[in-house]
Amino acid sequence: MPLLDSFTVDHTRMAAPAVRVAKTMKTPHGDNITVFDLRFCRPNIEVMPERGIHTLEHLFAGFMRDHLNGDGVEIIDISPMGCRTGFYMSLIGTPDEQRVADSWKAAMADVLKVTDQRKIPELNEFQCGTYEMHSLKEAQEIAQHIVDSDIGINQNDDLALPKDKLAELHI
């Protein structure tokens, strides 16, 4: 099995909250696609609660588009990481990390303004696969942590695992 890009960086040295360009690619038609690692928690130290991250997934997707889309950028998808320490965001365009960080913080401020769980988009059995697994309170606690924090920038070169370590770890 090929080694995926996300597993070539040292998770023990990742700062959080922080933005990282996880991958860039060009489509056959010349469009730039960028995948960002939006790291909410330090890997293996913190984890977002499942109800909170699920609610945040519903809210974050729209709010982030409100703040980041435009001027050569269009978000394709924002999805939570299985490890529950962050989200991956795929988009068309190449915004710099600071623009992404500023939009992320603004989106989290919007999450804090949601007054009632009934205002969570697509919170019903027809549009959500686990519609009863939500917590606005937990989502807002996660959002408050981001609003209260400085969002850093994780650089791939600073986090790269050495080739000998990758060889040792690869199964």
Swiss-Prot record:
Q: What is its EC number?
A: 4.4.1.21
Cofactor requirements of the protein: Fe cation
Catalytic activity of the protein = S-(5-deoxy-D-ribos-5-yl)-L-homocysteine = (S)-4,5-dihydroxypentane-2,3-dione + L-homocysteine
Instruction: List UniProt keywords, sorted A-Z.
Output: Autoinducer synthesis, Iron, Lyase, Metal-binding, Quorum sensing
User: GO molecular function terms here?
Assistant: iron ion binding; S-ribosylhomocysteine lyase activity
Domain of life of the source: Bacteria
Please indicate if the UniProt record lists Membrane as a keyword.
no
Q: How is the cofactor bound?
A: Binds 1 Fe cation per subunit.
Q: Which family does it belong to?
A: Belongs to the LuxS family.
What is the designated name of this protein?
S-ribosylhomocysteine lyase
Please name the source species.
Answer: Pectobacterium carotovorum subsp. carotovorum (strain PC1)
In the UniProt record, what gene is named as encoding this protein? luxS
